């Protein structure tokens, strides 16, 4: 099979983050891919694991570990891409014409740069037009998929062999280019074919709605868009934090035991930042130059300053602006290279980007479902040795309850996904 010639090269837009290492925040250098699929600079991994002096070699991204240190091999494909990116970035920064200083393997970049450049305004119009056209095509494709799912839904009850075949057809349709990441985090949990079809239809309708909103927004005049943004909150189904207006709910029945924890800076990971009031923790865009301390977490975690050793305590955490998170409690002696819930002296509920809510207690995971709580209430009753987690968005719903030992003080504990800069958790003011 003949390969593509140089004239058939496909231009691909890459940002530095696409080929970056989350440990050093730079381009990959001698990239090594772990068994979980995540890649890092080899020397960054070795330095990180060496500093931790840990018994398990965990991935800094997904936290999967192994009993023995994995053999690090060079990912030559990633290395080649990173090298090409470096060369292109140097050419752009120097402002030189690549046609006069060709670089091996960068002929497609050189030929593109050697062409006469369009005026910026013409480039912008062409890009906006292509974005609108693509959005319209995606909208039509999703409408077609919605029709397919609805027709399946209206058919007679499926036979035992039917659901797998028909759902596999839908899977092939999705693989043609529709990105389900635009839909709300929702796991297909129904056991019946009808339930699965209903869930797929729900996700498709959400994608359809957002695509239509995107096309409408692109076609609106710029002045009109600015006026609407100033005069009214966004109509998007994913409003910004300061634009959201959650339904009013009654005061929590635990309000009389409410506390207002603040983050402890000594335990704060270098990949996190804390607000001035010490009640908001954010994933940083770059490693922070905090002073080294044996009390500081090597993973993106933080404890609060308040030690809870007796009595009853309640606090709430707003998780709506974080895609992956865990909230719970831990002892101060928790190992700083371990992850919340994976130790005997910590417990938490955790939301994964795979649309799964889990509880971790005594190093065991309990899957709770696929509904994502926007606000989590934590109830710690040390008099009875109980810990409970509630979803308290609009009404109170128990998520998980377990027994705990009060042999040592416990501290509110938090984990955030370190690969999503800008994600944050807020310790809320409990409604009294």
Curated annotation (Swiss-Prot):
Disordered: annotated span: 95-121
Alphabetized UniProt keyword annotations: Coiled coil, Cytoplasm, Immunity, Innate immunity, Metal-binding, Transferase, Ubl conjugation pathway, Zinc, Zinc-finger
Domain B30.2/SPRY: 241-432
Mutagenesis / variant outcome for changing residue 24 to A: Loss of function in RIG-I signaling pathway
Function: E2-dependent E3 ubiquitin-protein ligase that functions as a RIGI coreceptor in the sensing of viral RNAs in cell cytoplasm and the activation of the antiviral innate immune response. Together with the UBE2D3, UBE2N and UB2V1 E2 ligases, catalyzes the 'Lys-63'-linked polyubiquitination of RIGI oligomerized on viral RNAs, an essential step in the activation of the RIG-I signaling pathway. Through a ubiquitin-independent parallel mechanism, which consists in bridging RIGI filaments forming on longer viral RNAs, further activates the RIG-I signaling pathway.
Biased composition (Low complexity): 102-114
Listed EC numbers: 2.3.2.27
Pfam families: SPRY, zf-C3HC4_4
Disulfide pattern: none
The organism's place on the tree of life at top rank: Eukaryota
Coiled-coil parts of chain: 121-156, 191-216
Assigned GO CC terms: cytoplasm; cytoplasmic stress granule; cytosol; ribonucleoprotein complex
Domain comment quoted from the record: The B30.2/SPRY domain mediates the interaction with the substrate RIGI.
Catalyzed reaction equations: S-ubiquitinyl-[E2 ubiquitin-conjugating enzyme]-L-cysteine + [acceptor protein]-L-lysine = [E2 ubiquitin-conjugating enzyme]-L-cysteine + N(6)-ubiquitinyl-[acceptor protein]-L-lysine
Name recorded for this polypeptide: E3 ubiquitin-protein ligase RNF135
Pathway entry: Protein modification; protein ubiquitination
Species of the source: Homo sapiens (Human)
Cited InterPro entries: B30.2/SPRY, B30.2/SPRY_sf, Butyrophylin_SPRY, ConA-like_dom_sf, E3_ubiq-ligase_TRIM/RNF, PRY, RNF135_SPRY_PRY_dom, SPRY_dom
Gene3D superfamilies cross-referenced by the UniProt entry: 2.60.120.920, Zinc/RING finger domain, C3HC4 (zinc finger) (3.30.40.10)
Lineage: Eukaryota, Metazoa, Chordata, Craniata, Vertebrata
GO molecular function: identical protein binding; ribonucleoprotein complex binding; RIG-I binding; ubiquitin protein ligase activity; ubiquitin-protein transferase activity; zinc ion binding
GO biological process, alphabetically ordered: antiviral innate immune response; free ubiquitin chain polymerization; innate immune response; positive regulation of interferon-beta production; protein homooligomerization; protein K63-linked ubiquitination; protein polyubiquitination; protein ubiquitination
